[in-house]
């Protein structure tokens, strides 16, 4: 069975979009899907000095580990994020930075995964 993780950056219309996508996969054979909202996790703002502290102590915060493990254990990723000033949301940028730094190899969280990027934006 293929495990699709749908990552919503926010709890606004993109969270609703994430749940609509999950509903789409509900009756598909061989597919399971789940939705997380990054707003549900207490993720510190990434900065190299903080990363060094965590690595020195061999311990990243629990919520970073939770999100990292969800992403690593998925077969595919769907990212639902609003557009902020012509780019992705800050919370999504932050989680991508943490996942790439909290793994042994920066690619471990994302390699060999199909990804889809979608948005619900009012502008």
Can you name each region flagged by the protein language model?
Residues 1-81, 86-97, 101, 105:
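N-terminal beta1-alpha1-beta2 submodule of the flavodoxin-like/Rossmannoid cofactor-binding fold
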Residues 109-123:
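Short, glycine-/small-residue-rich phosphate/pyrophosphate-handling segment
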């Amino acid at each position: 069975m293929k495990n699709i993780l749908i990552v919503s950056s926010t709890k606004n219309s993109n969270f609703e979009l994430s749940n609509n996508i999950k509903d789409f996969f509900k009756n598909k054979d061989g597919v399971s899907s789940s939705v997380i909202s990054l707003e549900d996790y207490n993720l510190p703002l990434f900065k190299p000095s903080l990363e060094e502290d965590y690595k020195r102590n061999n311990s990243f915060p629990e919520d970073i580990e939770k999100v990292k493990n969800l992403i690593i254990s998925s077969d595919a990723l769907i990212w639902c994020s609003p557009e902020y000033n012509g780019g992705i949301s800050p919370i999504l940028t932050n989680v991508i930075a943490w996942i790439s730094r909290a793994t042994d190899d920066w690619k471990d969280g994302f390699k060999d995964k199909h990804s889809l990027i979608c948005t619900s934006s009012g502008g």
